[in-house]
């Protein structure tokens, strides 16, 4: 598990994950709506990706309704609070083990 609030560090974490992990669970917060760099790094990652939002982005301000990273992720979980992390971990486990 890695965490950063710095866009460049998040990109570095995603890029290093290409050689270490089969999946990424990402809560990019406000960067979901603004960061082309994070989107591009996720797009290069070949594993499974779950985008996570603690709040329901569709119940918030209009500009939050569009996540630019959604187009390159495997699935999205939003609006379930911190329980979304448990669902994301369980879902990732299922996805990574479905062909074994």
For the regions a language model picked out, list residue spans one by one.
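Hydrophobic/aromatic beta-strand patches that form the interior of the parallel beta-sheet core
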Residues: 2, 50-52, 77
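N-terminal small/polar loop signature for handling phosphorylated ligands or for N-terminal nucleophile
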Residues: 3-46
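Alpha-helix N-cap/helix-start and coil->helix boundary motif
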Residues: 7, 31-32, 55-57, 82
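Structural motif
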Residues: 23-24, 48-50, 67, 74-75
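Short, conserved acidic/polar surface loops in the N-terminal third of protein domains
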Residues: 36-37, 60-63
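Short, acidic/small-residue loops that bind anionic groups at enzyme active sites
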Residues: 44-60
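Short beta-strand elements at the ligand-binding edges of bilobed clamshell
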Residues: 64-82
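A charged, well-structured terminal subsegment
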Residues: 78-100
């Amino acid at each position: 598990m890695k965490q950063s609030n710095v866009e460049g560090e998040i990109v570095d974490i995603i890029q290093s994950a290409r050689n270490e992990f089969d999946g990424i669970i990402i809560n990019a917060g406000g960067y979901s709506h603004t960061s082309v760099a994070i989107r591009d790094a996720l797009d290069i990652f070949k594993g499974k990706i779950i985008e996570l939002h603690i709040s329901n982005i569709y119940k918030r301000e209009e500009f939050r309704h569009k996540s630019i990273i959604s187009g390159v992720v495997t699935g999205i979980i939003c609006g379930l609070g911190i329980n979304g992390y448990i669902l994301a971990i369980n879902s990732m486990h299922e996805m990574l083990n479905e062909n074994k």
